[in-house]
Curated annotation (Swiss-Prot):
Its EC number is 7.1.1.2. One of its GO terms (cellular component) is mitochondrial membrane. It is a multi-pass membrane protein. The chain crosses the membrane at residues 1-21, 27-47, 48-68, 91-111, 139-159. This is NADH-ubiquinone oxidoreductase chain 6. Belongs to the complex I subunit 6 family. It catalyses: a ubiquinone + NADH + 5 H(+)(in) = a ubiquinol + NAD(+) + 4 H(+)(out). GO terms for molecular function: NADH dehydrogenase (ubiquinone) activity. Gene3D superfamilies: NADH-ubiquinone/plastoquinone oxidoreductase chain 6, subunit NuoJ. Core subunit of the mitochondrial membrane respiratory chain NADH dehydrogenase (Complex I) that is believed to belong to the minimal assembly required for catalysis. Complex I functions in the transfer of electrons from NADH to the respiratory chain. The immediate electron acceptor for the enzyme is believed to be ubiquinone.
Length: 173
């Protein structure tokens, strides 16, 4: 199980790198789908089944609509591929930043790795994902407002990610 979680975390990082160093909006969609599927599988392996399902539906339902909109506005006649030197340079620099962050975090001592599942306390504990559903309906107004602002911010981030070096998705239509 530990190797499976490590494999999922490696795939999640690779999906994030694919989104961050996308040469074209078409490839950014592939990285987003990979990162969302692997991230939800990671949560599912840790016992958070409901939150995993909700995030999977939000990511593939909402974010793919944003990417389709962005691809329609910022379509390139000749999209770059993964093998271009600029894209490889972006990927290598992102991996370098990630490795340096892990090294510095290891020296400072702020990295504590461990896997704890949701229902590892015992029989009398309440699963956290089911109590999260109750929080949606009891005092979740502020949480919904924060989530809405986060999704709006994510929309603008994705629109800027797909624009490339030329005029992109945020322009006068």
């Amino acid at each position: 199980m530990t190797y499976f979680v490590l494999f999922l975390s490696l795939c999640f990082v690779l999906g994030g790198l694919a989104v961050a160093s996308n040469p074209s909006p078409y490839y950014g969609v592939v990285g987003l789908v990979l990162a969302s599927v692997v991230g939800c599988g990671w949560l599912l392996s840790l016992g958070v089944s409901f939150v995993s399902l909700v995030l999977f539906m939000v990511y593939l339902g909402g974010m793919l609509v944003v990417f389709v909109y962005s691809v329609a506005l910022a379509a390139d006649p000749f999209p770059e591929a993964w093998g271009d030197w600029r894209v490889v340079g972006y990927g290598v620099s992102f991996v370098g930043v990630l490795v340096m962050g892990l090294v510095i975090g290891g020296f400072i001592g702020c990295l504590n790795f461990g896997v704890v599942t949701v229902d590892s306390v015992g029989m009398f504990s309440v699963r956290l994902d089911f109590s999260g559903v109750a929080m949606f309906y009891s005092c979740g107004v502020g949480m919904f407002l924060v989530a809405g602002w986060g999704l709006l911010l994510t929309l603008f981030v994705v629109l800027e990610l797909v624009r490339g070096l030329s005029r992109g998705a945020i322009r006068a239509v």
